[in-house]
Amino acid sequence: SSKDSKQLDAEVHRKYIYGGHVAAYMNILMEDEPEKYQSHFSSYIKADLAPDNIEEMYKKVHAAIRPDPSPKKSQKQPPKTHKRYNLKKLTYEERKAKLIERLNALNAAGGNDDDDEEDDE
């Protein structure tokens, strides 16, 4: 087994670098499960990538990386601000002000008969 000998097989390595394993898998899926191939490799199909031109694509990509290895900035959409379902906690002062506001509203609505609880006896 090659694991023990720690020897790097150049041909195998080359195959992986150029996506040979992907191309092989694409061929297997094409023959055995065409619908799975369609869904699994939909972006490849859109990009017009077939198993036989994957190696070409990788060679082009590698050739393009060599002159300028710095990653290209892609145009990303700015993240959307998410709606907060849990409201921010109010400070003690804000809670106190709200309570006073509620009490005032209750008193105004109740016509200021604060002592009606004692009259029920």
From Swiss-Prot:
Main localization category: cytoplasm
Domain of life: Eukaryota
Annotated stretches, region: Disordered: 63-88
GO CC annotation: cytosolic large ribosomal subunit; nucleus
Protein family: Belongs to the universal ribosomal protein uL18 family.
UniProt KW Ribosomal protein keyword: yes
InterPro entries: Rbsml_uL18_euk (IPR005485), Ribosomal_uL18_C_euk (IPR025607)
Keyword Nucleus: yes
Location(s) in or outside the cell: Cytoplasm; Nucleus
Gene encoding the protein: RPL5
GO biological process, one term: translation
Keywords recorded for this protein, A-Z: Cytoplasm, Nucleus, Ribonucleoprotein, Ribosomal protein
Protein name: Large ribosomal subunit protein uL18
Record's compositionally biased regions (Basic residues): 73-87
Function, as annotated: Component of the ribosome, a large ribonucleoprotein complex responsible for the synthesis of proteins in the cell. The small ribosomal subunit (SSU) binds messenger RNAs (mRNAs) and translates the encoded message by selecting cognate aminoacyl-transfer RNA (tRNA) molecules. The large subunit (LSU) contains the ribosomal catalytic site termed the peptidyl transferase center (PTC), which catalyzes the formation of peptide bonds, thereby polymerizing the amino acids delivered by tRNAs into a polypeptide chain.
GO MF: 5S rRNA binding; structural constituent of ribosome
SUPFAM superfamilies given in the database record: Translational machinery components
Assembly mode: Component of the large ribosomal subunit (LSU).
